[in-house]
């Protein structure tokens, strides 16, 4: 038995060496992202212990003493903080509204582009919709401020129609529509790439069979196109649910004013203020840890539902 086990071990070793020699360039390509994730994603995870420590910069993370209540001091503070639940609610509402509106947009655009027969027009539309993705958040918010301020083009049009000007930038009720609208404009074209790629892999014989059965464009879309890209849609939805607790704090900070803070203050901006501005690192880490656990819960539940109702899931 010992000889058999040793022989199997040698066989596995030889196969690994041969596979490595055969695909050495692929392994080399894989090495760079592997190193990136180890250094910038996994290695910093030890910083999560800040949530359970009385952090002192002079002592560092490892040298700082554990917090009171068996290390749960800051976790309990987060749970008992009424304002945390306010920003938690703002984050959930903003991201759910954003998901409901922005998630279908690239799918619809991809389906529309897929029906365009004129190749040049299709490329122009794709280029125009891709470009906003490459604009920085500062530029996008600056454009919004120029367009929607009291003397901007939008209020000029409203005034020319005999209506009162609207304070878009400071009125809390307009914050979410402006945030979501800018997200659609900035991301819809780029997100379309994934769905266009999925559409390009569909079997054209299915469309031919649908035409023979008398299906028009609409029925082909309903019964061939959408079912064909449904696995991609499900995977993208699961990944989107994992980001439901994450909001780009750069855009929020740039759009936030004293009058709209009641709806614009979210977890990421709250963590920024407590961690960076007030140097309350342990509390900010505890908030971030709670945020990550909720995101994991959303992904797990969505993946479980997907696995039970379809054959597509992340794991």
Residue ranges and their predicted role:
Residues 1-19:
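Short, Lys/Arg-rich, polar N-terminal cytosolic tail immediately upstream
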Residues 19-315:
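A structural signal for multi-pass alpha-helical bundles of membrane permease subunits
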């Amino acid at each position: 038995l010992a000889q058999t086990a040793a022989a199997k071990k040698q066989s596995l070793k030889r196969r690994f060496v041969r596979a490595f020699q055969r695909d050495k360039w692929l392994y080399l390509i894989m090495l760079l992202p592997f190193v990136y994730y180890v250094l910038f994603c996994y290695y910093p995870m030890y910083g999560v212990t800040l949530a359970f420590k009385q952090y002192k910069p002079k002592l560092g993370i490892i040298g700082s003493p554990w917090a009171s209540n068996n290390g749960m001091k800051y976790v309990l503070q987060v749970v008992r903080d009424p304002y945390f639940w306010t920003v938690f609610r703002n984050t959930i509402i903003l991201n759910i509204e954003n998901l409901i509106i922005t998630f279908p947009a690239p799918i619809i655009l991809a389906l529309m582009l897929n029906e365009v027969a004129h190749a040049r027009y299709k490329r122009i539309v794709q280029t125009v919709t891709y470009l906003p993705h490459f604009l920085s958040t500062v530029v996008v918010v600056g454009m919004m401020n120029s367009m929607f301020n009291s003397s901007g083009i939008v209020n000029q049009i409203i005034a020319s129609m005999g209506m009162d000007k609207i304070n878009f930038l400071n009125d809390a009720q307009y914050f979410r529509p402006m945030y979501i609208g800018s997200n659609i404009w900035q991301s819809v074209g780029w997100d379309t790439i994934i769905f266009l790629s999925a559409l390009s892999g569909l079997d054209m014989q299915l469309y031919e069979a649908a035409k023979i059965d008398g299906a028009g464009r609409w029925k082909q879309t309903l019964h061939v196109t959408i079912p064909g890209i449904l696995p991609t849609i499900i995977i993208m939805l699961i990944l989107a649910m994992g980001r439901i607790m994450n909001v780009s704090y750069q855009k929020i900070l740039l759009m936030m004013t004293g009058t709209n803070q009641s709806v614009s203050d979210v977890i990421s901006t709250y963590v920024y203020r407590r961690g960076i501005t007030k140097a309350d690192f342990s509390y900010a880490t505890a908030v971030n840890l709670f945020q990550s656990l909720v995101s994991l819960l959303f992904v797990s539940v969505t993946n479980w539902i997907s696995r039970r109702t379809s054959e597509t899931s992340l794991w």
